[in-house]
Regions:
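Conserved beta-strand in the GNAT
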Residues: 60, 66-74, 81-86
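A conserved beta-turn-beta hairpin within the catalytic core of GNAT-like acetyltransferases
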Residues: 74-83, 92, 113-114, 146-150
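A short beta-loop-alpha structural element at the N-terminal edge
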Residues: 1-16, 22-27
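Conserved acyl-CoA
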Residues: 99-115
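C-terminal "cap" of GNAT-fold acetyltransferases
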Residues: 114-134, 140-158
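A short helix-loop-beta-strand connector motif used in the catalytic cores of GNAT acetyltransferases and
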Residues: 42-60, 81
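Conserved GNAT-fold acetyl-CoA-binding loop/helix
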Residues: 18-47
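Conserved acetyl-CoA pyrophosphate-binding loop and the N-cap/start of the following alpha-helix
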Residues: 61, 91, 95-103
């Protein structure tokens, strides 16, 4: 079940960030020196609270009472920015990520968005293919100085 998150849910949300992104941080060699917050795998609570307070729409995917997935999105000028879709490693490959993405698409349409945009580690071929299989296309790249990866920019027309 997907439900909107309140400020009191943020500690559980942070757990999903830390454990969900840890596999990515390890796979791509993300450290505090080459990538802020290790690509969100060590995101501090104050940054998550700041995102919540600045209007990021946050949703949790629950298996029973446990938050096992997260969706963060922002609306601006007819475009939905997909900040994060995270599923805990032990719950992956069960359709939870797809459910979160489909939910994001519905919410974006309801709010008048014509597109969803995101940035991701382009070397993460499995994730890139997943987004492509779900209607996203590559629209460019960005290389950040000192980062051990290139960001692939993707978008999906709704």
């Amino acid at each position: 079940m997907i439900k909107p998150l309140s400020k009191s849910d943020l500690p559980d949300c942070l757990n999903v960030f830390h454990h969900g992104y840890e596999t990515v941080a390890v796979e791509f060699g993300l450290t505090e020196e080459n990538c802020p917050d290790r690509g969100r795998a060590s995101l501090p609570m104050e940054k998550l609270v700041s995102e919540f307070e600045s209007g990021t729409a946050m949703f949790g995917y629950y298996a029973g009472d446990e938050m096992v997935g997260y969706l963060g999105m922002k609306m601006a000028e007819g475009v939905c920015g997909l900040d994060d879709i995270i599923v805990l490693p032990e719950y992956r490959h069960n359709g939870y990520g797809k459910a979160l993405l489909d939910f994001c698409k519905r919410k974006a349409k309801e709010n008048g968005a014509g597109k969803i945009r995101l940035g991701m580690i382009d070397d993460n071929r499995q994730l890139r293919k997943w987004y492509e299989d779900n209607g996203f296309v590559n629209v460019g790249y960005k290389k950040y100085e000192g980062a051990p990866f290139t960001v692939g920019k993707m978008e999906c027309t709704l």
